[in-house]
Amino acid sequence: WRITQILNTHEHFDHIDGNQAMVAATGAVVLAHANAADKIAGMDAGLQAGATVTVGRSVALEVLDTPGHTMSHICLFKKTGIPALFSGDTLFNAGVGHCHSGGAPEVLYRTAVEQLAGLPDNTMVYPGHDYIVNNLRFTLDREPGNQVAQKLLAEVERQDPNQALITDMALEKQINTFFRLDSVEVIANLRRSFPDMPANPGPETVFLALRQLRNSW
């Protein structure tokens, strides 16, 4: 095999800093969001939602336009075989990305809840960073009675980092507080932090409050 393509999910330096050296070593082309050309030096082609990137002879990745963490963020969805999501910094295991480096929480809500949450439950999640331990702790800070998150935290705190857990969307909906927007316990605890929150807040209100708390947690 050989490297022919470099896929950048977004423009942050920790995701693109190796582009130049990799291109020099392999001659690969750099692909990223169509609107990221002025942010990613040496980008060869821009990707639009719905485009397909072929890897090797058998893997096809659908491009998803997933703004929120930044406004030029893509995720890559593998439909062939077991579905998989390469989610960059939009969706983490048990969490979502921040929005203070070129993003917007209202947009991230629409991406995460109205787009990614609709992927098949057996979709494996491969994020750009492994923050699962800290994210599970935040979930339990917001929803202490979440027994699935309690059990999983105990497991991942002891796991071999070379055999790290891979979650799927079904599990994310149980452990990721940003998908648990109708949880009675989550809402009750939020209302202690935000006394003006309505008794029955909508999902976007809950998401934005959680994102605000997570910014300084």
Name each region found by the language model:
Residues 1-65, 82-83, 151, 155:
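Active-site HxH/HxHxD metal-binding segment of metal-dependent hydrolases
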Residues 1-2, 75-88, 94:
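Conserved beta-strand hairpin/beta-sheet module of binuclear metal-dependent hydrolase folds
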Residues 11, 35-36, 69-70, 90-91, ...:
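Active-site metal-binding loops of divalent metal-dependent hydrolases
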Residues 22, 89, 129, 169:
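Residue-level signal for inorganic ion chemistry
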Residues 31-32, 86-87, 127:
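Hydrophobic residues in well-ordered beta-strands that form the structural core
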Residues 38-41, 94-101, 135:
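A short acidic, helix-capping loop that chelates divalent metal ions and anchors anionic groups
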Residues 102-111:
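Charged helix-capping and loop-helix junction motifs
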Residues 110-124, 131-217:
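Accessory terminal helices/loops
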